[in-house]
């Protein structure tokens, strides 16, 4: 359908969270494939729809523009200009690295959030009221992430093969942490916790931390 209506000078972009599949489809089916430059603005919230629009949503947030081997450099510059005009910081990235990076920084955290809520439900089936009443801090923040659109996240999980590797790595580290706690290994536990604190500090220094987190 796009092949019938697209003009020669038309610029197309998408804002999906995974890139491998959409780029494969684009390169296979679109005549003017060089007119399609894929984007991924790293901004959003757990709510969706026009009623939740936010004029400052992209302000000072990263937007990844996907760099392929064969591409129209003028179109990349034009798309970069567009994202910068609405406040984004632009970075170029190839589709393979994009899907690997965001399987860890975005997709895995959401998966963990969904599973944590399931775990909390399973452990409190008799005392659901208590679960809700005392969900301050950690669980409440995770529940915000788990409130994200389930259809969108189903598609993200199914379209990024890297999520399985991310889950395996997370499981490996979780089992390691479990053994440390079982063995009451004070030194190793403090080291793990301290290291996580340092990474958190680095994230803040890179201005990736905001009052209302974006995922």
Predicted regions located by residue number:
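Rossmann-like NAD(P)(H) cofactor-binding subdomain of soluble oxidoreductases
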Residues: 2-51
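Glycine-rich beta-alpha junction loops
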Residues: 19, 40-43, 97, 136-139, ...
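Short, flexible, solvent-exposed loop/turn segments with mixed acidic/basic and small polar residues
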Residues: 52-57, 152-155
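Internal alpha-helical scaffold of NAD(P)-dependent oxidoreductase catalytic cores
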Residues: 55-144
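Small-residue-rich helix-loop
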Residues: 193-200, 207
């Amino acid at each position: 359908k796009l092949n019938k209506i697209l003009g020669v000078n038309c610029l197309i972009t998408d804002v999906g969270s995974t890139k491998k599949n959409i780029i494969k489809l684009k390169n296979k089916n679109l005549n003017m494939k060089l007119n399609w430059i894929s984007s991924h603005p790293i901004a959003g919230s757990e709510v969706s729809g026009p009623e939740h629009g936010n004029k400052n949503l992209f302000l000072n947030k990263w937007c990844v523009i996907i760099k392929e081997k064969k591409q129209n450099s003028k179109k990349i510059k034009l798309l970069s200009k567009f994202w910068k005009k609405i406040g984004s910081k632009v970075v170029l990235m190839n589709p393979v690295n994009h899907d690997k990076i965001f399987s860890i920084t975005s997709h895995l955290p959401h998966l963990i959030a969904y599973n944590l809520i399931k775990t909390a439900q399973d452990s409190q089936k008799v005392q659901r009221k208590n679960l809700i009443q005392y969900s301050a801090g950690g669980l409440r923040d995770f529940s915000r992430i788990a409130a994200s659109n389930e259809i969108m996240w189903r598609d993200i999980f199914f379209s990024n093969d890297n999520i399985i590797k991310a889950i395996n790595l997370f499981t490996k580290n979780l089992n390691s942490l479990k053994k440390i706690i079982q063995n009451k290994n004070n030194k190793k536990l403090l080291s793990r916790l301290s290291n996580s604190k340092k990474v958190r500090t680095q994230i803040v220094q890179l201005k990736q931390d905001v009052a209302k987190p974006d995922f």
